[in-house]
């Protein structure tokens, strides 16, 4: 599809089209867009933290542009004659939303499709390391195994996300401090340090706390022979989407004290 634009500058062409003067091929909430209605653009795919655009090598277009949800140009490339693919870095600080991928020449938009870039990170499972020591990372110390949590998360969205916070609140021995400046996620190759891992669309990963939420001690909860029940919340924070998700869990403490306590957790019903 070719739409002539009465403009003298290429950037004006891009922003005008982004504002809605061009009908584009359908937008998908999966990680990629096949583009039967996208003219010379055959496919747009999210590959990790990059956007891969495939197009007709014989296109008349001379450039490629990616327009952000705001209507501003997110990226621009000159096309190499005879090439059929361009890769655009997305990174982990992009504004989430619907982007428009365009093939352009000096005075017109040759083809365009929409692509969703929006992370959606969910908690799939949570385990106390003390109850599953075999699932902790190699080299974890005994106190770390006693105190930390393993969280399985999945990105069911269409864009990558950098995890910047893993917080715990509620009826646990050591809630996450409000003034914590680090992520609260352990770097497993250097477990005494924090990390901010990236999770790509479609990926499932385990992350490990490093704030000792279930360390023995503290006066927030007590462990009793008859059992003490409570509830706590797990919060994930991302660089792109902000607060991504929170999940509540029921917890029971049974034993003489927190240094000799059986702790069981179960996902709370919504």
Model-derived features with residue positions:
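Terminal disorder- and signal-encoded targeting elements
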Residues: 1-270
């Amino acid at each position: 599809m070719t739409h002539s634009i009465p403009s003298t500058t290429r950037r004006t062409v891009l922003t005008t089209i982004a504002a809605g003067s061009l009908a584009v091929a359908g937008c998908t909430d999966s990680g990629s867009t096949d583009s039967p209605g996208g003219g010379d653009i055959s496919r747009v795919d999210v590959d990790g933290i990059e956007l891969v655009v495939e197009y007709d090598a014989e296109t008349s277009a001379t450039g490629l542009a990616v327009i952000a949800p705001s209507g501003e140009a997110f990226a621009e490339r000159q096309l190499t004659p005879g090439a059929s693919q361009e890769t655009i870095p997305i990174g982990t600080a992009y504004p989430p939303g619907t982007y428009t991928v365009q093939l352009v020449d000096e005075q017109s938009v040759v083809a365009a499709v929409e692509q969703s870039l929006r992370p959606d990170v969910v908690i799939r499972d949570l385990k106390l390391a003390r109850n599953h020591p075999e699932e902790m990372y190699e080299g974890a110390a005994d106190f770390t195994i006693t105190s930390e949590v393993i969280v399985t998360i999945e990105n069911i969205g269409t864009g990558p996300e950098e995890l910047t916070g893993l917080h715990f609140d509620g009826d646990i021995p050591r809630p996450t401090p409000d003034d914590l400046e680090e992520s609260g996620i352990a770097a497993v190759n250097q477990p005494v340090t924090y990390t901010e891992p990236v999770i790509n669309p479609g990926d499932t990963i385990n992350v490990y706390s490093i704030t000792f939420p279930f360390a023995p001690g503290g006066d927030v909860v007590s462990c009793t022979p008859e059992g003490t029940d409570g509830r706590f919340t797990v919060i994930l924070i991302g660089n792109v989407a902000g607060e991504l998700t929170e999940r509540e869990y029921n917890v029971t403490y049974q034993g003489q004290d927190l240094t000799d306590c059986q702790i069981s957790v179960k996902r709370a019903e919504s």
